From Swiss-Prot:
Task of the protein: Oxidoreductase; part of the gene cluster that mediates the biosynthesis of squalestatin S1 (SQS1, also known as zaragozic acid A), a heavily oxidized fungal polyketide that offers potent cholesterol lowering activity by targeting squalene synthase (SS). SQS1 is composed of a 2,8-dioxobicyclic[3.2.1]octane-3,4,5-tricarboxyclic acid core that is connected to two lipophilic polyketide arms.
Molecular function, one GO term: oxidoreductase activity
Family classification: Belongs to the asaB hydroxylase/desaturase family.
Organism per entry: Cochliobolus lunatus
Keyword Repeat in record: no
Top-rank lineage group of the source organism: Eukaryota
Keyword Nucleus attributed: no
Name of the protein in question: Oxidoreductase clz15
Matches recorded under InterPro entries: AsaB-like
Length: 286
């Protein structure tokens, strides 16, 4: 008997809940010291992108569902974390595939610079995953808290690390984006919040002794998204291996910057397999 696809589901997402002392948030990864409260959980209705009309697009909304058939096998993805040869293969083959899909959906792209590749896998159930958010071992786990990968200062930092300060200054004169190709996710659409920007809707968690620098480059703080009742929540049901979501995890025009998060879907069976995802981040200039 066929099962109907629901246009929406209900789930839980974590959002910024401030600090214990009212000051800027910090996390010391060496000692575990922090003043950041655990993310506050909100029950949300999440609408299926497949059922939306019109469909969201990268150029209009900052995110888009696309097909990206790949020649890379699951074994080759796994090997990327085990050997330099495996890592080099991903950079040579998969990065080229991701660049091509960004060119197709973005249009008018001047420069695309892939900067990172990561595989994430959930280890354990909801409670343990949430509790481990600040732990070193959670660095490759899904992030069940709404966030942005970068804002303007931290995007400039990774650009300078990648191409050098002189080349960075040349590129900074152009419109810049940080698209990621990733699955599975919940997007926080803020089309109904015309004043949305990094200053009003993002809390900072300053990092000390951060082990993630080797994976993602220097980032002085993480950007955790604040609650706003005007958000619309979107996801993709039954995402297939040949599909992915291209979105702007940072954009120099805040309208296109897309807050995102793993979320806990109440309709997922208790014995469902752990959440897994593959992501590539690129710096894109127009």
């Amino acid at each position: 008997m066929a099962t109907a696809t629901l246009p929406a589901t209900v789930g839980v997402i974590g959002l910024w809940d401030g600090t214990t002392d009212g000051k800027e948030g910090f996390m010391d990864y060496a000692t575990g010291d922090t003043n950041v409260k655990q993310p506050k959980e909100y029950e949300i209705e999440v609408h299926d992108i497949r059922k939306l009309d019109p469909q969201p697009t990268l150029l209009n909304n900052g995110y888009e569902l696309v097909d990206i058939p790949t020649v890379v096998t699951e074994e080759q993805f796994s090997e990327s974390g085990k050997s330099e040869k495996g890592k080099a293969y991903i950079k040579d083959v998969y990065f080229a595939e991701c660049k091509r899909i960004i060119q197709e959906v973005a249009g008018g792209v001047d420069t695309i610079i892939p900067v990172s590749f990561r595989m994430r896998e959930q280890k354990g159930e909801k409670e343990s995953t949430t509790k481990k958010l600040g732990n070193i071992e959670s660095r490759y786990a899904p992030r069940p808290v709404a966030h942005l990968d970068r804002d303007t200062p931290t995007a400039i930092t990774v650009l300078e690390e990648t191409v050098g300060k002189e080349k960075a200054q040349e590129l900074l004169s152009k419109h810049k984006r940080n698209p990621a190709t990733m699955w599975p996710l919940c997007f926080l659409n803020h089309d109904r919040i015309p004043t949305w920007n990094y200053d009003t809707h993002v809390g900072h968690v300053w990092s000390l002794n951060d082990p993630r620098v080797s994976d993602r480059g220097e980032k002085t703080y993480d950007c955790v998204v604040k609650y706003d009742e005007r958000y619309d929540y979107h996801y993709v049901s039954d995402l297939k291996p040949e599909e992915c979501l291209v979105f702007c995890s940072f954009d120099s025009i805040p309208k296109y910057a897309m807050p995102h998060s793993a979320f806990w879907d109440n309709n997922v069976p208790a014995d469902a397999p752990n959440r897994r995802s593959i992501e590539v981040r690129s710096l894109v200039f127009f």
